[in-house]
Design a protein with these regions (language model features):
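Accessory terminal alpha-helical modules
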Residues: 1-340
Length: 340
């Protein structure tokens, strides 16, 4: 029923749109959700069944915007359904981490940033974007926290921590895994000196993190998201046994402490072509991060690294500089000196 058909005085502001506004009365027929089926099912489940949550009883009173389409033919309805779903904007990686209740890595990532129990304050993590500009006032991104959680748990070699992203882990396994990753994160933030101010989260945090990330900073790499992921991967690799029968040469705490001796400036020659492109930008791809992590593990271990792992580092480092050491052994570039 159009608003213009009512025998009531309509304000002048609405009169010109009277044919486009009105009331919809549905009498009979069948309602089919062309889009939002999961949301509809979730609302129905909360309304029909007792649900935990302070506001579950109020859901039945919520107002939801809906677009109604008249079914003219199966062909037209099917076409609309296909178009809506085919061109739907996919959720971002950050959104998936924020909302997933099945992915154990995502659940633990959020716990690391909780107000009461977390290691990181919400304000120091960018929840929306996967990258940080030099002017960003965040320390890292939720995507990088997620990736480090995966690295830590997979590196633990504990079978119960090898989560299937589509199946929610047992509460007990989540608790144990959280204790494990939160301890490593706490060690990183306390033992890696450039990170100490992040936990303090003082009133001057924004200025400090921008200064630390600037290309001129002595520690600029440690504040670039891709390099942060590579850093954690490299430290964890250095803490793995060098052979099947060996004990690790370093504990995670020792590795973080030793990392303070590494030169972390983006302008330092050791990172050129490894994770820093010729343009000066970060190479955030998988190969760049892998090269950086290998080089970090070498600098932390030095000659304590097994020969086969050192060969892998030598190959990756030289390939970054356009040298194939198997075909041109005489052109091999020496690895940067390991820390002492």
């Amino acid at each position: 029923e159009k608003l213009s058909e009512f025998n009531a005085k309509v304000p002048n502001a609405y009169q010109s749109q009277g044919d486009k506004m009105g009331f919809l009365t549905i009498d009979g027929g069948t309602l089919i959700a062309l889009d939002g089926q999961h949301r509809l099912l979730a609302l129905k489940e909360v309304i029909d069944n007792p649900t935990e949550g302070d506001y579950s009883a109020d859901v039945r009173n919520d107002e939801v915007s809906v677009i109604f389409l008249n079914h003219e033919s199966s062909t037209k309805t099917r076409s609309i359904f296909n178009t809506v779903n085919k061109y739907a904007k996919p959720t971002s990686a950050g959104d998936n981490i924020i909302t997933s209740e099945e992915d154990g890595y995502a659940i633990l990532t959020r716990r690391l940033i909780e107000v009461d129990d977390g290691v990181l304050a919400e304000s120091v993590v960018n929840w929306k974007n996967n990258t940080l500009t030099d002017k960003s006032t965040h320390f890292t991104t939720i995507k990088i926290v997620y990736e480090t959680v995966k690295l830590m748990l997979k590196g633990s070699k504990v079978p119960e921590y090898d989560f299937e992203p589509t199946t929610r882990p047992r509460a007990e396994d989540l608790d144990h895994a959280y204790n494990y990753v939160s301890e490593i994160w706490q060690l990183m933030m306390t033992e890696v000196k450039p990170y100490n101010f992040v936990l303090e989260n003082g009133s001057d945090f924004s200025e400090k993190v921008q200064e630390a990330r600037s290309p001129e900073s002595n520690n600029s790499l440690l504040f670039k998201p891709a390099a942060q992921e590579a850093f954690v991967k490299g430290v964890l690799a250095a803490c793995q046994p060098q052979t099947d029968d060996d004990e690790p040469e370093l504990t995670i705490q020792e590795a973080f402490k030793r990392s303070n001796k590494i030169r972390w400036s983006m302008s330092d020659d050791i990172w050129q072509n490894v994770i820093i492109k010729s343009s000066g930008a970060i190479d955030g791809g998988a190969e760049g991060k892998n090269r950086m992590s290998l080089l970090i593990s070498w600098m932390l271990l030095g000659n304590k690294m097994s020969d086969d792992k050192k060969l892998k580092v030598r190959k990756a480092f030289n390939e970054a500089h356009g040298i194939d050491i198997e075909q041109n052994p005489n052109k091999e570039k020496s690895l940067p000196e390991a820390i002492k």
